[in-house]
């Protein structure tokens, strides 16, 4: 069995207010995306990595992210699609894994994943077919319509989904193919498995595993990076 990692890094991140893809913004002394790739490149349980970004950014990605850090497991860059779901599907087509191989899909803008979470996520995907990392929500959640609260879900049942999300290759490949055929858009890759009636295991993750989306997130990520913790590769 081989373990593949797909890293979608095609989003411009308009909420960041930057003129470049947020994955190329500096975190410490190197780009955000290079931290993310390093987490998996250094992990002994990972075999192959594919980075998904706009084709027009291939030279930039190689120059700023791939070449300077001598990654050993990056097998190639994959052209992103119009939406994240399209980008992941392109990545699945590129990796050409076997049916029973495991594929982890991880946001390029999540550079602080604790490496210790990778092995249990892969193991759960081997056993169940699909597994994701997440954390219990801290705040009370409200369902709102037209500015008015409809209801308050039981917070003890709510988890915030993160990445990586891990799957048997054949399962997630077929889910994406059916979603394309039926014009179904999922909010994440695990939701495609749920849509088809499949079960997805939840692995408790870390609140440090943030997705860098806003300028405030970048400040918080830098603070985490400067603080010893379980996220360091």
Curated annotation (Swiss-Prot):
Q: Does the keyword Transmembrane apply?
A: no
Q: Gene name on record?
A: ispD
Q: Where is this site: Positions MEP for the nucleophilic attack?
A: 155, 211
Keyword match Nucleotidyltransferase: yes
The metabolic or biological pathway listed in the UniProt record of this protein is: Isoprenoid biosynthesis; isopentenyl diphosphate biosynthesis via DXP pathway; isopentenyl diphosphate from 1-deoxy-D-xylulose 5-phosphate: step 2/6
- Which family, according to UniProt? Belongs to the IspD/TarI cytidylyltransferase family. IspD subfamily.
Q: What is this protein called?
A: 2-C-methyl-D-erythritol 4-phosphate cytidylyltransferase
What NCBIfam families has UniProt attached to this entry?
ispD (TIGR00453)
Name a biological process GO annotation: isopentenyl diphosphate biosynthetic process, methylerythritol 4-phosphate pathway
Q: Name one Pfam family in it.
A: IspD
Among InterPro entries, the record links this protein to: IspD, IspD/TarI, IspD/TarI_cytidylyltransf_bact, ISPD_synthase_CS, Nucleotide-diphossugar_trans
Function recorded in the entry:
Catalyzes the formation of 4-diphosphocytidyl-2-C-methyl-D-erythritol from CTP and 2-C-methyl-D-erythritol 4-phosphate (MEP).
Site annotation Transition state stabilizer: residues = 15, 22
Q: Which reaction does it catalyse?
A: 2-C-methyl-D-erythritol 4-phosphate + CTP + H(+) = 4-CDP-2-C-methyl-D-erythritol + diphosphate
Could you say which EC number(s) this protein's record lists? 2.7.7.60
Please name the GO terms that the record assigns under molecular function: 2-C-methyl-D-erythritol 4-phosphate cytidylyltransferase activity
Keyword list, A-Z: Isoprene biosynthesis, Nucleotidyltransferase, Transferase
């Amino acid at each position: 069995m081989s373990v593949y990692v797909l890293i979608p890094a095609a989003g411009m991140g308009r909420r960041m207010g930057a003129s470049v893809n947020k994955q190329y913004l500096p975190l410490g002394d190197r780009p955000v995306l290079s931290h993310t790739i390093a987490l998996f490149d250094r992990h002994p349980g990972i075999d192959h990595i594919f980075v998904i970004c706009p084709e027009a950014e291939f030279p930039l990605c190689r120059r700023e992210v791939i070449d300077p850090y001598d990654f050993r497991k990056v097998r190639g860059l994959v052209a992103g699609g119009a939406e994240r779901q399209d980008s992941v599907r392109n990545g699945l087509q590129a990796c050409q894994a076997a049916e029973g191989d495991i594929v982890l899909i991880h946001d390029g803008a999540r550079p602080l994943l604790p490496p210790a979470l990778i092995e249990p996520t892969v193991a759960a995907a081997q056993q169940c077919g699909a597994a994701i990392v997440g954390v219990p929500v801290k705040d009370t959640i409200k369902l709102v319509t037209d500015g008015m609260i409809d209801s308050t879900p039981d917070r003890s049942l709510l988890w915030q989904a993160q990445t990586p999300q891990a799957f048997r290759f054949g399962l997630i490949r077929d889910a994406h193919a059916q979603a394309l055929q039926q014009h179904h858009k999922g909010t994440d890759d695990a939701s495609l498995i749920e849509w088809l009636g499949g079960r997805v295991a939840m692995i408790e993750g870390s609140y440090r595993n943030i997705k860098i989306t806003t300028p405030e997130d970048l400040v918080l990520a830098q603070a985490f990076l400067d603080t010893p913790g379980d996220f360091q590769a």
